């Protein structure tokens, strides 16, 4: 394709997006094609090709049209209650075998102490996830253990929003106890879990999953569990682990599956939906060596992340309006830049974060509210605290 033809096609595609049309996967793939993506890692933000700048400006304009100029944030705390895990994902530096150096499993008093500390600092949300610990049972059953965690937290802090337990954890509990996904989700919901993290998605393409996380749930199971959550009234987030072995085509397939999932929830009038999309760039600093060698870089390539951020807004924005970068993975400066490439939310304070930090991420584990606010105002945008479901506080 000549440069002139590329520019014409890009202009047509971007104009369609600005007019409110959903782009096809083929159209969207052109935005990530090698012709528009000439070794971005070596370019400065001030010397981008015209094609990349056009994509960035389109994403920024769509963000403004779809959700406005206000940038939101949430005061929350991550609690990773155990890193003991039966699985061995090739990108994970977090998991440990029981009894090995670095393994941990918090008891309920430690979890409550962390929740109390979060409340004292103004948190409205606890995000709680952990490894798949086969010993995490009550009377030989997994679900009662998880329900006990939820009830103890809710008994002490009834106002806290519990954003807890990924689709992978739901499948693990269901498998261990021989019950359905619906049974597990309904029980967690009734105990006080208000929403489900859309993690463990990685890339929703089984060819990728067989290499990077062969023990994890497959694409169909992830989609089934998230769709079941929506049907049962439990909102979810959505994520993509990017920048490792996946191709642009597989990235677009992932986005297409998320869009279709959200369309189903809306068309069937389910009581819950996907609330946000978060791009999670691969961090390989401390990841297992085989994948590090295959990927060829230990930290995210910022411009690659920004381009995919923009393309995600362009492809998903009609259906999933809230887009968030990961300051843990790309740093606060990178997250601030992402607010110009289609993101409207800067995420949360977290207060602690183990999974990405143990992989070697540069962003740290805690962000003061004032730092988030200053990052937003430095762009000439207004900030607004929100809750987990994007209600202004």
From Swiss-Prot:
It comes from the Bacteria. It catalyses: 5-amino-6-(D-ribitylamino)uracil + L-tyrosine + S-adenosyl-L-methionine = 5-amino-5-(4-hydroxybenzyl)-6-(D-ribitylimino)-5,6-dihydrouracil + 2-iminoacetate + 5'-deoxyadenosine + L-methionine + H(+). Pathway: Cofactor biosynthesis; coenzyme F0 biosynthesis. Its EC number is 2.5.1.147. Its cofactor is [4Fe-4S] cluster. One of its GO terms (molecular function) is 7,8-didemethyl-8-hydroxy-5-deazariboflavin synthase activity. SUPFAM superfamilies: Radical SAM enzymes. Residues 71-318 form the Radical SAM core domain. [4Fe-4S] cluster binds at residues 85, 89, 92. Keywords: 4Fe-4S, Iron, Iron-sulfur, Metal-binding, S-adenosyl-L-methionine, Transferase. Binds 1 [4Fe-4S] cluster. The cluster is coordinated with 3 cysteines and an exchangeable S-adenosyl-L-methionine. Catalyzes the radical-mediated synthesis of 5-amino-5-(4-hydroxybenzyl)-6-(D-ribitylimino)-5,6-dihydrouracil from 5-amino-6-(D-ribitylamino)uracil and L-tyrosine. PANTHER family: FO SYNTHASE (COFH), LIPOYL SYNTHASE 2. Belongs to the radical SAM superfamily. CofH family. Consists of two subunits, CofG and CofH. This is 5-amino-6-(D-ribitylamino)uracil--L-tyrosine 4-hydroxyphenyl transferase. It comes from Trichodesmium erythraeum (strain IMS101).
């Amino acid at each position: 394709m000549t440069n002139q033809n590329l520019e014409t096609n890009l202009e047509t595609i971007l104009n369609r997006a600005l007019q409110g049309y959903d782009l096809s996967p083929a159209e969207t793939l052109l935005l990530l094609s090698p012709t528009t993506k000439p070794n971005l890692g070596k370019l400065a933000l001030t010397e981008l090709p015209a094609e990349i700048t056009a994509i960035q400006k389109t994403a920024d304009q769509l963000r403004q049209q779809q959700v406005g100029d206000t940038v939101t944030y949430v005061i929350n705390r991550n609690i990773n209650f155990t890193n003991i895990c039966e699985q061995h994902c090739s990108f994970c530096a977090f998991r440990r075998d029981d009894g090995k150096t670095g393994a941990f499993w918090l008891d309920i008093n430690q979890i409550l102490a962390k929740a109390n500390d979060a409340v004292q600092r103004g948190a409205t949300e606890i995000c709680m996830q952990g490894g798949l610990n086969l010993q995490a049972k009550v009377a030989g059953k997994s679900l009662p253990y998880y329900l006990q965690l939820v009830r103890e937290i809710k008994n002490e802090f009834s106002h806290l929003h519990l954003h807890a337990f990924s689709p992978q954890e739901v499948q693990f509990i269901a498998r261990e106890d021989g019950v359905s996904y619906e049974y597990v989700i309904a029980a967690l919901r009734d105990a006080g879990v208000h929403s489900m993290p859309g993690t463990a998605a990685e890339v929703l393409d089984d060819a990728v999953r067989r290499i990077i996380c062969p023990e994890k749930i497959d694409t169909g199971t992830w989609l089934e569990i998230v769709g079941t959550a929506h049907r049962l009234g439990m909102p979810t987030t959505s994520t993509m682990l990017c920048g490792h072995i996946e191709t642009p085509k597989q990235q677009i397939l992932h986005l297409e599956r998320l869009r279709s999932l959200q369309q189903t929830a809306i068309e069937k009038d389910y009581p819950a939906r996907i609330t946000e999309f978060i791009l999670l760039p691969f961090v390989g600093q401390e990841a297992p060596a085989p994948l590090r060698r295959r990927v060829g870089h230990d930290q995210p390539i910022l411009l690659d992340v920004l381009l995919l951020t923009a393309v995600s807004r362009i492809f998903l924005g009609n259906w999933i309006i809230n887009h968030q970068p990961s300051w843990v993975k790309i740093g606060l400066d990178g997250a601030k830049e992402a607010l110009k490439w289609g993101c409207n939310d800067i995420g949360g304070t977290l207060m602690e974060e183990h999974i990405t930090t143990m992989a070697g991420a540069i962003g740290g584990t805690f962000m003061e509210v004032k730092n988030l606010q200053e990052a937003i105002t430095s762009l000439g945008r207004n900030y607004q605290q929100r809750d987990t479901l994007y209600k202004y506080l």
